[in-house]
Amino acid sequence: MRLYLDSCVLIYALDGALHLQQRTLQQLEHYAQADWVISDLVRMECLVGPLRTADQIRLLAFRSFFSDCSVVPLHPEVMERAAELRAATRLQTADAIHLAAAVHWGCDALLTNDRAFQLAQAPIGVLRLEPDQPMSPQT
């Protein structure tokens, strides 16, 4: 299974409050055998906080996590698909890019905590991360 990880998942896992970190890491462990996929946009969004505060330990934690993922580029075809998704749904720009990247790079599902994907009628599975509840596929 190829599983695209939304930025919020990594931020919860590595930079969230302790209870969010623990619950998110438990849920990620459930998908330990999956091929975790992130895009350059995920990398950028995750690094902003640690760069802003010059927190080298957090930077190292994120970069270490990235090394366990397949990092996919955002080709023009991905951006074109993101524009189509943005035009057809209520997704914000970054969310449309995440979904387009996941679809373009053959992911089976996208793991997120963002409710907006529920309304987008995504062409792939959407797994909602809920730190206080077990994950479940969205239909």
Predicted feature descriptions by range:
Residues 1-38, 50-61, 127-139:
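Short, well-structured N-terminal submotif of metal-dependent ribonuclease cores
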Residues 10, 43, 79, 117-118, ...:
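A generic structural signal for short hydrophobic patches within well-formed alpha-helices
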